[in-house]
Amino acid sequence: MTIETRYATILLLLSGVALLSGCADDPPTPAEKAAAAAVPGAPPGGVADAEAKNAAASNVKESNDLVEFAYAYPREAAAIPEFAAWLDNDRATRRDALIATARRDKAAAEKAGFPYRAHSHLQTWQRVSSTPRFLSLSAEIQSYTGGAHGMTSFATLLWDRNRAKRRQPLDLFTSGEAFDSATRERFCSGIKRAKTAKGILVEEASDSPFAKCPPASAQTVWLGSSDGRYLDRMTIAIAPYEIGPFAEGSYKINVPVTGALVSVVKDEFKRDFLPIN
């Protein structure tokens, strides 16, 4: 073997070692993880767990002359199979309802000789917070089913990891009345401040439909966390027409998680809250 041949052979071997070393450092793909979880002796449910951990956020959109539909939820929800299944079913239910209403209204418009405007439902779930026990989601929904303008509404969901079940924030409290009593003062004063910030004079006439502060329990409650461990933040979303005319729009009122509020939390959930005082 000549010196040139020996040198070329050494270079080839070294490049092969480097290539193997580089391959060894590459992280396994989702498919490889799922395959590893499926081998004999792997823990039961390993394949499903591996697939769930690699689940992507869901975002379904549809737009045509009849409807505009969108429904999305984050990766954290997609990673919980039972929760994702419920969200997928909710999406299908809302889409079917939108299409049924749109077809009915389109037929009625054509019969009466009026133009039809596509109906819509646009809903995006977003993560509010994630603690060891709860995944908290919020949604702002834009919808249109005819008329002068569309509507804004809100939704809320909690996933209880300990019980593997879906909950509403008010499920964590002893009653809606107790929740209202613990939040009324801060909630109502928050509404007044929010209206003042918009330059709106707060109506106080007894005969005004918007003079009375509504019960917080009748609105949409979002529970959050500042540290990823405890529920210690709360926002109450108010849709248009609830406390003012449509032109005022919606409101989002931050209400502190006080000791008084935590005192009306059910015993099962008290350890998951952290009051500010």
Predicted regions and their residues:
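Bacterial N-terminal signal peptides that target proteins for export
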Residues: 2-11
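Residue-level signal for mature regions of secreted extracellular proteins and peptides
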Residues: 16-17, 206
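C-terminal motif of bacterial Sec signal peptides marking the signal peptidase cleavage site
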Residues: 19-22
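Short, functionally important structural connectors and interaction interfaces within domains
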Residues: 12-15, 165
